[in-house]
Amino acid sequence: MNWLGAFLTVVSSYICGIMLANGENERLCIIDSLLRLFTYMHRRISAERLPLYRIFVEFSDEYLERIGFLERVRSSRHGLENVWQSAVKLLPTDREVLDELVRFGESLGILPLDEQIKRIEVTCIFLNEKRAKISGALQQKRKSIKSVCLLMGIAIAIILL
């Protein structure tokens, strides 16, 4: 019976490690959603010269909808830079990404279309670099989290035996 308890302790610790490791994917999910938004904005502004509020109304992303980001930016047709700033605060991401999004929002809707397109491109480049950096470290971090949880489970099982 003790061995069964030890085995269950190790397995449950490993499962907890898997769940924690999967939680690390959220950082990458945020960047992917923002990249989709900026790519969509770039395409629609470049090709069709659509106003920003229409772009936000027509864009859909499950993650950005769930955290309330898109609802916030859709809430106003005027003063998008202020609405953008409050929507950016909803994003659970690191300071570097938030600062870049705030800088983008300061000129949102104010710049001429050509300059706005260039600003979107700069932000896309930043997000792509950030995504590459995160995804490169993510696999190793996930593997480490699972290993540490497994070792903790083994240590607990040994102590209990």
Language-model-derived ranges and their functions:
Residues 5-16, 135-161:
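Bilayer-spanning, highly hydrophobic alpha-helical transmembrane segments
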Residues 5-74:
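Juxtamembrane/interface alpha-helical elements of multi-pass membrane proteins
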Residues 32-35, 39, 64, 78, ...:
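Generic structural signal for well-ordered, non-transmembrane alpha-helical segments
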